[in-house]
């Protein structure tokens, strides 16, 4: 048994205070919860692969606000955030994947495996999010590894930017991030995505590239659709490909259905199949998969939000 096959299980607190004159103060604290066993999830304090995590996932650290922990000021000119938050380039992974970033259907793990520690979230960040400007929203972020100024490496320092355009049924986005990983090394992530809602179906496309210093570029793409089934169901389907630039490739197909019992409760089921070639050994949700092997997986569950 596992959790978060449809949405990530979480417990959080957020609030907004009206300061007057069009200015608001906001806070957001959100902790990941593994509701199948009651454990919490580790956070990362310095955006680095070593020395950053408080403990291994599901470890003795208990509950941490690993998902979100920031304060912000919001005004007519946009929002400024300080703390731990999503990386702007990650947002397209969840917006433009029919399966979001959860369960056997998602391609997030498949197509961001080379993106480094800050591929999803960054600690010690300063971000600006613009207001909607004729359909355009711009999101810029800088984050820091909190190393000594004279350290040989400024690992964990970096930045990201994202622009999204929405106009009726059309949605487009592009994003880029760069994070220092060591002395003279970094990881750069780029993605371009879009969707078009035809009414009978929402068509979705996504492309990404991760570039690590001294390694081949890893590229991937996803095409898929969301098909509403009246009155309370949605069929989800996607095909994805990942290529590590050295001949290792992975193809993945996913098909799922979500049935809303109410605004807060839904039943879901997903089937996914993955195949590797050229020495690739990608897996579904950690399943043991040998090089050039394949795996299949199923999700059946219930999501309740409160």
Q: Where do the language-model regions lie?
A:
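Short sequence motifs at beta-strands and strand-loop junctions characteristic
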Residues: 3-6, 61-63, 118-120, 153-155, ...
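Structural signature of outer-membrane beta-barrel domains
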Residues: 32-36, 82, 87-91, 145-147, ...
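Residue-level detector of the transmembrane beta-barrel scaffold of outer-membrane proteins
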Residues: 24-28, 79-83, 137-139, 171-173, ...
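Membrane-embedded beta-strand positions in outer-membrane beta-barrel channels/transporters
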Residues: 10-12, 68-70, 125-127, 160, ...
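Detector for outer-membrane/organellar transmembrane beta-barrel domains
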Residues: 154-260, 272-273
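Outer membrane beta-barrel
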Residues: 1-145, 155, 164-171
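Outer-membrane beta-barrel "beta-signal"
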Residues: 259-261, 293-306
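Extracellular loop and loop/strand-boundary signature of outer-membrane beta-barrel proteins
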Residues: 55-57, 148, 210-211, 241-243, ...
């Amino acid at each position: 048994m596992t959790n978060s096959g449809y949405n990530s299980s979480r417990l959080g607190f957020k609030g907004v205070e009206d300061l007057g004159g069009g200015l608001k103060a906001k806070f957001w604290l959100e902790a990941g919860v593994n509701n199948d066993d009651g454990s919490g999830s580790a956070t990362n304090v310095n955006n680095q692969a070593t020395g950053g995590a408080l403990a291994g996932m599901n470890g003795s650290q208990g509950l941490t606000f690993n998902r979100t922990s920031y304060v912000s000021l919001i005004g007519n000119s946009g929002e400024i955030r300080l703390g731990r938050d999503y990386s702007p380039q990650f947002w397209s992974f969840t917006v433009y994947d029919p399966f979001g970033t959860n369960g056997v259907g998602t391609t997030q793990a498949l197509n961001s495996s080379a993106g480094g520690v800050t591929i999803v979230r960054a600690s010690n960040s300063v971000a600006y999010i613009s207001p909607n400007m004729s359909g355009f929203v711009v999101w810029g972020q800088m984050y820091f590894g909190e190393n000594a100024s004279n350290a040989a490496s400024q690992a964990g320092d970096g930045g990201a930017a994202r622009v999204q355009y929405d106009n009726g049924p059309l949605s487009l986005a592009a994003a880029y991030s760069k994070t220092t990983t060591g002395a003279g090394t970094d990881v750069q992530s780029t993605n371009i995505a879009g969707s078009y809602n035809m009414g009978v179906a929402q068509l979705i496309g996504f492309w990404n590239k991760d570039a690590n210093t001294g390694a081949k570029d890893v590229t991937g793409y996803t095409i898929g659709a969301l098909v509403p089934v009246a009155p309370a169901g949605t069929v989800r389907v996607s095909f994805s490909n990942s290529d590590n630039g050295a001949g290792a490739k992975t193809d993945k197909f996913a098909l799922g259905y979500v049935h809303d019992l109410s605004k807060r409760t839904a039943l879901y089921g997903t089937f996914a199949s993955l195949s590797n070639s050229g020495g690739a050994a990608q897996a579904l949700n950690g399943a043991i998969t040998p090089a050039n092997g394949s795996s299949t997986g199923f999700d059946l569950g219930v999501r309740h939000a409160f």
